[in-house]
């Protein structure tokens, strides 16, 4: 799975806290869209914008932190 984020995002820490709590960090490729402009382009091509956090799994992109956390808890807890 891929997780698009940037460090100053106010919603990203909650997603990272859930990932840490579930001990599943190894399941992600984390892509900071501010450190790597190519990641921002990937995200824009995929979703039409550069809103983060964005989790991409086999079903496609998921954009809301609340939805991402709920998905992670239901699939990895």
What do the predicted segments below correspond to?
Residues 32-49:
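Thioredoxin-like thiol-disulfide oxidoreductase module
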Residues 57-77:
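Non-catalytic, surface beta->alpha helical segment in thiol-disulfide oxidoreductase systems
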Residues 10-11, 37-38, 63:
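Short alpha-helical
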Residues 1-27:
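Local sequence-structure signature of Cys/Sec-based thiol-disulfide redox active-site neighborhoods
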Residues 46-56, 65-66:
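Structural micro-motif
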């Amino acid at each position: 799975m891929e997780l698009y984020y940037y460090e100053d995002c106010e919603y990203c820490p909650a997603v990272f806290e859930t990932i840490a709590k579930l001990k599943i960090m190894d399941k992600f490729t984390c892509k900071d869209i501010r450190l790597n402009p190519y990641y921002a382009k990937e995200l824009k091509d995929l979703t039409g914008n550069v809103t983060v956090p964005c989790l991409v799994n086999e079903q496609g992109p998921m954009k809301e932190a609340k939805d991402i956390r709920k998905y992670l808890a239901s699939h990895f807890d």
